[in-house]
Amino acid sequence: MTGVVYAFPWNAPRSAIASSYLTYDQQHRRDRMFAALLHARKVLFLQPECVRFDVYRTAAVLEQNQGSQRANAFLISFCKKALPRLELVAKKYECSGINSNVSAAVFDGHFDTQLMQYLASRMVNMVARFNRLPDMSRADIDLLAADIANFIRAELADIDDTGFSELKTLYTWYMRAGFISLQFNVTPPKWERVTKKYFCEDEIAPAVMRMFNEVWWRGRLRRIAAAWREHLQIAVGNVSKKRHAYASKNCVTDWREQKRRTREFLKGLDLEDEEGNRISLIEKYDGSVANPAIRRCELMARIRGFENICNELGYVGEFYTLTAPSKYHATTKAGYRNSKWNGASPSDTQSYLTGLWARIRAKLHREEIRIFGIRVAEPHHDGTPHWHMLMFMLPEDVERVRLIIRDYAWEEDHYELRSDKAKKARFHAEAIDPEKGSATGYVAKYISKNIDGYALDGETDDESGELLKETAPAVSAWAARWHIRQFQFIGGAPVTVYRELRRMADPETARALSVEFAAVHDAAHYGRWADYVNAQGGPFVRRDDLQVRTLYEPRTEFNQYGEETVCIKGVYDASIGAGSPILTRLTQWKIVPKRAVDLAVDVKGASAPSRSSVNNCTGSESDPPILDLTKPLSRRERRELTNRLRKKKPTTRRKFIHGTDKQNVAITKTIDEIHSDNRHHNQPGRSPAPDGRW
């Protein structure tokens, strides 16, 4: 069919200039989208800056690459899915208002006087600032800590304790300060003992001093702020296998920076004894269990010793894995948001696992089943902890131990354990097969993975898919942020005595004390953990039945809260008594700043001092080392370059040199006239004359 031919071109029909009208359904859909977008922007504005920054940045990238419609859809979807999760986190940290206990104790339940209104305004101001902790800098947090401490101090000074005994006065002070502390989600020291009326003056007085101490509040608020920020990152999904496994990027950065600052601080300090002899503090630090390599070696030696004891006693090894129910996990195994999450933090999950194990241990004790071993706490990709346990027991107790642990592990939220896969995820047991490897080999990977990634080159993580060598810092940052104890031995002898005996390098003195003491010392001296545990009484020895114990003595000085502190002085044989100890710490050391000469020598790459007493050459501070910018800079070179750029050069002022005595007289006269004019100007009622003079 041919087209219609018109006589003139303008006779042909043309398309409409305006678009067709929207249908009612399209209009309602558009209005709902606008309303949802406005609501999303409104609620997002109320969230902490650490959350808004990432969301706005992602929306800006989407708008630039895919258009504004895609960015708006992202904002609406984010607020719909993530806002309930953020509200769960906020309920755990925010202060919704002034508690009734604080209102009754501080304001007497009324605000009709000017003083009460002033106190209420201060309290409201501090509560509002507390709710902004995730976005506050360290200086702002320290300022809030000082304000809270001063507020509590003023409240305690205002209490009328006339006619009170000393104990009643301390109790009144404690309860008033405790209510204010609870207002800011900080549990007062000794709170459970004091509320149960099971305390003495020596315990309650230091607790009161802590609650009006600025330094104490500073540490509590910093810890809350750090946990709050990390919990928000978990809620929005930034801690997962899709973003950053185990810990957020800022958490790992803060951990690295804290480690660097700690080392820089220790490098400037020395240990000095009574005679003035000095040793480097950083060298002693690196030679202790604070060094990850030494810590890992000690853990491996201890677990190897437990395995030797297991073989001697005819025990068998079992490897268990305990995982919390799904409501404790923020994201799924695939990295998506878990709709069952109840807002639990990693510390909440660790508390659940600790309570679960306490019930299991009590059940085993009631049935007289004895086990010993080690448990390792490590995170899932979303930061939720789970436990790996290597336990040794009698062969006839294996099935009963498995049954007890399984029943307690499956008890909570058992309705979700409908498949074998779900049951295995909650609790998994595996017998140690000597043909496949030793018991130590089962946990060696977990120990190295959670410390420094030693001997794991090329191996990848099962959850995140990243190299284990690269995920080790994230795991350490996770444990430090949530204050989770990664390794704990169950059974055996205390490691403190073991370390003190290794400091003692005199076997003759040990043999002179007793044969039993010498056996314990020799085992510790040569690093034989199995022999040490057996010499102390075996893997199930009670603390009251130890052969060798640690000797503690009180210090001569008290701490800043008036408490008596104790320190380790040595060890003693329990059969002989603490009256005949062996002192392992004879020298009293104190931490002092390094000498200026030592600091100059310790600077790596610094210029050597001149041979003469006068150095006329330009110092290294004016001539910094030239960096080779043709190749990538190392981390240390980048930091030095940044510090050099930030450093301000001191402004040098030229000293005015007066010419002659006549000029000096003129200058002095001018200064006197200026002072005279200022005095006249400051007099009340003075007005300027027509010529401008006062």
From Swiss-Prot:
Role according to the record: Endonuclease which induces a single-strand cut at or near ori. May act by forming a covalent link to the 5'side of the nick.
Active site: Y442 (o-(5'-phospho-dna)-tyrosine intermediate), Y446 (o-(5'-phospho-dna)-tyrosine intermediate)
UniProt record similarity statement: Belongs to the phage GPA family.
Any one Gene Ontology molecular-function term assigned to this protein's record: endonuclease activity
GO process annotations (BP): DNA replication; viral DNA genome replication
Record field: compositional bias (Basic residues): 644-657
The name this protein goes by in its record: Replication gene A protein
Keyword Nuclease set for record: yes
EC numbers, comma separated: 3.1.-.-
Organism field: Escherichia phage 186
Keyword tags: Covalent protein-DNA linkage, DNA replication, Early protein, Endonuclease, Hydrolase, Nuclease, Viral DNA replication
InterPro entries for the chain: Replication_gene_A-like
Cross-referenced Pfam families: Phage_GPA
Bias-annotated ranges (Basic and acidic residues): 634-643
Biased composition (Polar residues): 609-621
Region (Disordered): 605-659, 672-694
